[in-house]
Amino acid sequence: MIIVLLGPPGAGKGTQGELLAARLGIPKIATGDLFRAAVRDSTPLGIEAKKYMDRGDLVPDSVILGILRDAMASAEAAHGAILDGAVRTVPQAEGLAQVLKSIDRKVDAVLLFDANHAELIRRLSSRTTCDICQTPFKAFEPGTACPRNDGGRLIRRKDDEPEAIQNRLSIYEELTAPVVAWYQTHGVPVERIDAIGDVTDVTMRAAEALKHVPRAD
């Protein structure tokens, strides 16, 4: 089963993707994690991606699809995957469909995590990130030692500053929301999930929604 996660920044897609991947026994493939690894290693892709990420802008489709093509062709994704951050625009949805078609695969379902703007801004503005492992944390002040004890310090990422948050939400509304309509018109089930509340409750809502989606693998 190949599942695309959609939703605005701060909706908790990353956390829910990990929990659902464990339940389904398939990997979560997050473009954000791939980009951060590339940035950490200062690869040409990482340097290019960082310019966009620091501004809170979307990384170009050519970069995203190149990474996804390799990830989806890997043995790890042979029985499916949960894609987080892979599709944010209609051209990306179209590009992903072509990439999957080339390996005789398709998107089986879309989970759309919803939350109001006030909650999203509250979540994002209170988030700090380890400058080494790039793991985000809530309720920790900048300068605090990373809870993972990797020697890193928590920082406020540029794209988690108020101005960048507003920019990211505006981009989502303008470019990402139409992706929902695209998938619906192409016959892909789109399940809306209330992302407000306890993490476990949100996971249960998503798992319940997936019960009615046929598994391809």
Where in this protein do the model-derived segments appear?
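Glycine-rich phosphate-binding loop of ATP-dependent small-molecule kinases
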Residues: 1-217
